[in-house]
Amino acid sequence: MKLFETRTAPNPRRVRMFLAEKGLLDQIELVQVDIEKGENLSPEFVARNPMKKVPVLELEDGTCVAETMAICRYFEESYPDTPSLLGESPLEKALVEQWLRWIEFYFMMPTGMCFQHTTGYFKDRMNPIKEWGEECGQGVDKFMHFLNKQLEGKEYLCCDRFTAVDINSYFRQADADAS
């Protein structure tokens, strides 16, 4: 299996941590994609993921799976004898999904919008609106306060153990701090 990724990008880092926690990282060939040079726009890459984003998992038969949590779900289901990071019981699975959605909608998306609209990094690919980016940044601050409240007296955000929720919140917080 091959994981097409960019070492510094947050979503591939989430997949790598997920794989490391499951003890599977050494079973994957990591293929670096230079998004700054536009390698993700090449016909070869677009054939793997028409959304032109990393990460992309390419299976032995050539099937490609894109999107961070879809890749994580593949490994969760394919390797049931490894630590469960997406929940074991129906309740745990529901709680993990709830938290993953909250982090996605109220933390990841606004952090990404803040970065894209305030740094100029994507100015050649989009029309950044600084005010929108700043407003998104304020929403990120509010959600970070919410996360801190939820963690008071606890080691983990969900299920009283380490899950994908902790991975996703960790990397997004690191990105939010950098933005």
Positions of predicted regions on the chain:
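GST-like fold's C-terminal all-alpha helical module
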Residues: 103-179
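GST-like domain detector, emphasizing the conserved glutathione-binding G-site
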Residues: 1-134
